[in-house]
Amino acid sequence: MDLTSKVNRLLAEFAGRIGLPSLSLDEEGMASLLFDEQVGVTLLLLAERERLLLEADVAGIDVLGEGIFRQLASFNRHWHRFDLHFGFDELTGKVQLYAQILAAQLTLECFEATLANLLDHAEFWQRLLPCDSDREAVAAVGMRV
């Protein structure tokens, strides 16, 4: 079974488990979810690298002061403690928190644990960071959970 099929099968099982009608990657290898109208998560299959990337939108870059970047860099220095790291998406203007799962480790249990860890940290950082006034743009994308 190719990796796209494996991920789509896993996402369908996950969708059924949490009560969604369906969930699968689009033709570009992406899927989006929105949790509690607060945290947008994009799933991106990097087939050539044999991994699934999870990206959680945390805040708008423009609402952050310079001091926060030191905290984010400090968190990244210890990425191995949480298997997460921060980055910036200049196209969307978002600070994002990233996790990845190697194809060899991709099971439903691993996916759910990684997603839960990502959501816990994203929600924690959202409480610490200034409020992002552009939540409507996130709400318009993906499947609501």
From Swiss-Prot:
Name listed for the protein in its UniProt record: Transcriptional anti-antiactivator ExsC
Localization per record: Cytoplasm
Cytoplasm as UniProt keyword: yes
Phylogenetic lineage: Bacteria, Pseudomonadati, Pseudomonadota, Gammaproteobacteria, Pseudomonadales
Activity regulation (record text): In the absence of inducing signals, ExsE interacts with and inhibits ExsC activity.
Functional note: Part of the regulatory cascade that plays a role in the transcriptional regulation of the type III secretion system (T3SS). Interacts with antiactivator ExsD to inhibit its activity leading to ExsA-mediated transcription.
Sorted UniProt keywords: Cytoplasm
Main location per the UniProt record: cytoplasm
InterPro entries, A to Z: Tir_chaperone
Effect of a null allele: Deletion mutant results in a two to three-fold reduction in extracellular exoenzyme S activity representing the efficiency of type III secretion system (T3SS). Mutant also demonstrates a lag in the induction of cytotoxicity towards Chinese hamster ovary cells and is attenuated for virulence in a mouse pneumonia model.
Quaternary data: Homodimer. Interacts with ExsE. Interacts directly with ExsD to form a heterotetrameric complex.
One biological process term in Gene Ontology: protein secretion by the type III secretion system
